[in-house]
């Protein structure tokens, strides 16, 4: 297990904020008192990997002068199989049971209820593995709701039609796989003002890169880039993006390691290698590998021809050399009625 050896507060911490080690230690201790719930890890203590602990200490330990958290929105973008669901479930339980908030409302959101249920189900199993929480929590599976009895707080999965509703008094939102959102309606309902009555709400957005640059996820992704590069300022916004640069060699194991901070722990390098070799032999898999394994934003999920091979066809051709040769024509019948 790769542990965080020496913590250094995020560069997004403002000059007026401070790092409260006790608050951060408490958050880490709460999460590490939980257990993993799946596969060979099931029942074992949830020991935070170094990158996970960095995020938790930044979010729960960086406080404003009034003692409340500086960051209200966290955007975590990372490849698949890095432990996203477990981290999101642990954060949900911390906001529900360990944040000292009376009648806290924590919501699980995703493109559909089944997707949101993934994190919820992990949280339910974490509760069942933890005797201290089990006797203080009521689980309503049929409603996809967990109630923490001492503070009458709840964590609930929302249905798809919630985008047409208002009136939430949000303390926490766990937004899983933001890149799959078909539009921005649910995002706006849950993040625009729903937590204004709370002193330190946390909107925890965790996702893999997508393939739609017109989506709400790409909008948030671009905001994260703009803040990191100094073009925008938002002291309440925190982001971490793990991935490969567009011009990096996607077949290089060093690039895999850079993009996958849990490589060798939650996912074996042999699995990534096999997926890469398959993508090299089957060009249609390349974009999926780049998107899901390297967290690169791609223009489509399946590519018929690698762009380097397409670009290699851009050489001058003499029409005289083509005279007398067979010519092929093509028409594209797309939904927008374009003609090629």
Q: In which residue ranges do the predicted regions lie?
A:
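Residue-level detector of conserved catalytic or cofactor/ligand-binding positions
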Residues: 331-340
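Phosphate/NTP-binding elements of NTP-utilizing enzymes
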Residues: 1-331
């Amino acid at each position: 297990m790769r542990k965080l050896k020496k913590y250094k507060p995020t560069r997004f911490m403002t000059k007026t904020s401070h790092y409260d080690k006790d608050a951060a230690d408490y958050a880490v201790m709460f999460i590490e008192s939980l257990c993993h719930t799946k596969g060979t890890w099931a029942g074992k203590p949830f020991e935070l990997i170094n990158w996970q602990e960095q995020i938790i200490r930044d979010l729960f330990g960086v406080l404003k002068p009034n003692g409340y958290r500086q960051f209200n929105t966290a955007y975590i973008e990372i490849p698949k199989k890095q432990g996203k669901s477990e981290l999101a479930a642990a954060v949900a339980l911390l906001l529900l049971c360990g944040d000292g908030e009376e009648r806290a409302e924590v919501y699980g959101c995703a493109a559909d209820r089944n997707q949101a249920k993934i994190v919820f189900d992990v949280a339910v199993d974490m509760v069942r593995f933890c005797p201290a929480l089990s006797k203080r929590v009521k689980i309503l599976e049929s409603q996809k709701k967990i109630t923490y009895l001492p503070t009458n707080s709840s964590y609930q999965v929302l249905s798809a039609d919630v985008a047409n509703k208002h009136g939430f008094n949000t303390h926490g939102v766990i937004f899983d796989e933001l890149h799959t959102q078909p539009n921005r309606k649910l995002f706006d309902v849950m993040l625009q003002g729903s937590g204004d009555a709370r002193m330190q709400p946390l909107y925890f957005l965790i996702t893999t890169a997508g393939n739609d640059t017109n989506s709400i996820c790409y909008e948030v992704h671009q905001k994260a880039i703009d803040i990191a590069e100094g073009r925008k300022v938002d002291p309440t916004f925190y982001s971490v993006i793990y991935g490969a640069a567009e011009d990096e060699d996607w077949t290089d194991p060093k690039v895999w390691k850079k993009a996958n901070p849990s490589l060798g722990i939650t996912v074996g390098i042999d699995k990534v290698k096999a997926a890469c070799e398959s993508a090299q032999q089957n060009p249609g898999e390349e974009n999926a590998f780049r998107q899901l394994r390297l967290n690169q934003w791609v223009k489509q999920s399946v590519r018929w021809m690698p762009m380097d091979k397409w670009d290699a066809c851009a050489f001058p051709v003499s029409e005289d050399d083509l005279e007398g040769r067979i010519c092929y024509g093509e028409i594209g019948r797309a939904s927008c009625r374009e003609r090629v």
